């Protein structure tokens, strides 16, 4: 039943009221709106759904949200900036974003010190009228405060946090969980291999994809595996069977790409392990990631997604996603980690960006069970169907400080740190990556870009919960890392501020010991 909610100071239902500050108290299926001070604000209340519009541009509109509702929302549209303080709020929406920000300027959401606030969404079916996220922002978004903010998205197509522009996070304890499925799969489109500047194989109808094999005037339009003739599918299955028979066991005599763990291509097949599984590196099957076939999904349930840049300055951020295509943190224009503790676990890329990813001082644990742990897809790089074909020598990943643990447990060709042949720069910090990788081919620094001595451990056997320790020449322990899964023949990129050129070091773990000398800024250790 529709009810008009009376504010303590003003009565508002589709009429213009005067206020600068607004308090909204949710109570079950009702919401009570209290206004104070004067400004041009229009408030509409329908049950526990509150819509606020303000034409005031010069003042930052201040809102306080408190109480609890299992079927409520806030829709906010102001011409100026706004600040929303969450003060012990528990708000669930049964359809669409419980916090829907239509602002044309930045909105700050503050978790009040000492409070626990939980925002949830259970369905995102009406994508025309409601945006598919717990927090959906049209403009820049700042998440801050000394309290806790829990973001829970259980509905199909529902993301955790989605912004069309930049997202900044600082101080807050932020926990993001998504568990719904995506809304379908897009046909796979192949954009061509990087190469000729005068054309190639662009995407159909897209003249911006100019790389690829030079001279090719045409293009390769998107295709769907279901459209492939049955006889061709049978040929694929026969190829799979022959590979499995030929490559059963060790494949060290088979060659393959230089530096691949195991020296060659491992068997095709289901390569998506659960926690604790032990696998050997290899190509995934034709339906999975890697060379076998990339997937693009409609409304994949990502944790934090921005079409702009994501910057994390401080705070404690935990992100958990669980379904195909659901990347943990995605910033189309880059991601910057300046500080804080960040823990991301995803079946897809844990951290993904369409531009440079910078690590300047945070403690970051990025873990993927089915793809790369950290994946930067800048302009240029390797296999441009997944990026752009404009060649660009700007760094894809820069590590200046902090701790970066990037762990992919799926096997080759997925990596801990993946930048597709674009430059990877290491200037400082502690790094330990885990992944099947592609050896020395794409995602390692050079002697020029390794400002801090760095090694690539090729073929280290990662065993679940077994400590990996690094010692200097005097047997002094430098660092210890424990991985929560097993992976045979990992290609692990490792650096530490204690590493010095000319120094000798030893890596030890159960069943593995390797001593090496840092004769160059970047050293591959087999």
Where are these regions (language model features)?
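A periodicity- and composition-biased signal for non-globular, repetitive helical segments
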Residues: 8-9, 246
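A composition-driven surface/loop motif
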Residues: 19-526
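Hydrophobic h-region of N-terminal signal peptides that target proteins for export
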Residues: 10-18
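Positively charged n-region of N-terminal signal peptides that target proteins for export
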Residues: 1-4, 8
């Amino acid at each position: 039943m529709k009810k008009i909610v009376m504010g303590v100071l003003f009565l508002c239902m589709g009429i213009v009221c005067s206020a600068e500050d607004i308090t909204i108290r949710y109570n079950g299926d009702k919401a009570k709106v209290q206004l104070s001070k004067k400004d041009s604000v229009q408030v509409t209340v329908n049950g526990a759904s509150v819509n606020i519009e303000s034409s005031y541009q010069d003042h930052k509109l201040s809102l306080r949200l408190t109480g609890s509702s299992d079927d409520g929302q806030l829709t906010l549209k102001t011409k100026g900036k706004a600040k929303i303080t969450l003060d012990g709020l528990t708000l669930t929406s049964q359809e669409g974003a419980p916090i829907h920000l239509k602002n044309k300027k930045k909105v700050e959401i503050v978790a009040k010190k000492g409070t626990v606030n939980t925002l949830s969404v259970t369905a995102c079916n009406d994508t025309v009228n409601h945006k598919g996220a717990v927090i959906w922002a049209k403009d820049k978004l700042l998440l801050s405060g000394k309290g806790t903010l829990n973001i829970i998205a259980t509905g199909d197509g529902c993301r955790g946090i989605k912004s069309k522009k930049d997202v900044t996070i600082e101080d807050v304890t932020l926990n993001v969980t998504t568990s719904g499925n995506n809304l379908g799969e897009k046909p796979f489109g192949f954009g061509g291999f990087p190469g000729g500047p005068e054309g190639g194989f662009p995407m159909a109808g897209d003249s911006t994809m100019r790389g690829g094999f030079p001279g090719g005037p045409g293009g390769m339009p998107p295709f769907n595996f279901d459209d492939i003739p049955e006889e061709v599918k049978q040929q694929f299955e026969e190829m799979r069977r022959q590979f499995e028979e030929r490559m059963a066991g060790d494949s060290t005599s088979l060659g393959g790409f230089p530096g691949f763990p195991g020296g060659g291509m491992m068997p095709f097949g289901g390569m998506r392990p659960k926690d604790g599984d032990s696998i050997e590196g290899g190509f995934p099957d034709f339906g999975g990631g890697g060379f076998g076939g990339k997937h693009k999904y409609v409304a994949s349930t990502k944790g934090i997604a921005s079409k702009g840049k994501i910057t994390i300055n401080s705070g404690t951020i935990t992100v958990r996603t669980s379904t195909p295509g659901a990347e943990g943190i995605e910033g189309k224009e880059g991601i910057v980690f300046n500080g804080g503790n960040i823990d991301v676990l995803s079946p897809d890329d844990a951290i993904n960006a369409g531009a440079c990813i910078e690590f300047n001082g945070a403690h970051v644990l990025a873990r993927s069970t089915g793809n790369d742990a950290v994946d930067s897809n800048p302009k240029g790089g390797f296999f441009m169907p997944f990026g752009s074909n404009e060649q660009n020598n700007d760094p894809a990943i820069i590590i200046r400080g902090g701790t970066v643990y990037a762990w992919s447990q799926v096997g080759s060709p997925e990596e801990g740190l993946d930048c597709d042949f674009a430059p990877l720069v290491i200037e400082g910090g502690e790094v330990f990556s885990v992944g099947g990788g592609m050896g020395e081919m794409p995602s390692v620094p050079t002697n020029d870009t390794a400002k801090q001595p760095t090694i690539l451990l090729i073929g280290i056997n990662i065993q679940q919960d077994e400590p990996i320790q690094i010692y200097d020449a005097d047997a002094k322990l430098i660092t210890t890392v424990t991985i929560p899964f097993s992976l045979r023949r990992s290609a692990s990129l490792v650096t530490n501020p204690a590493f010095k050129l000319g120094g000798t070091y030893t890596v030890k773990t159960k069943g593995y010991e390797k001593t090496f000398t840092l004769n160059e800024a970047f050293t591959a250790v087999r």
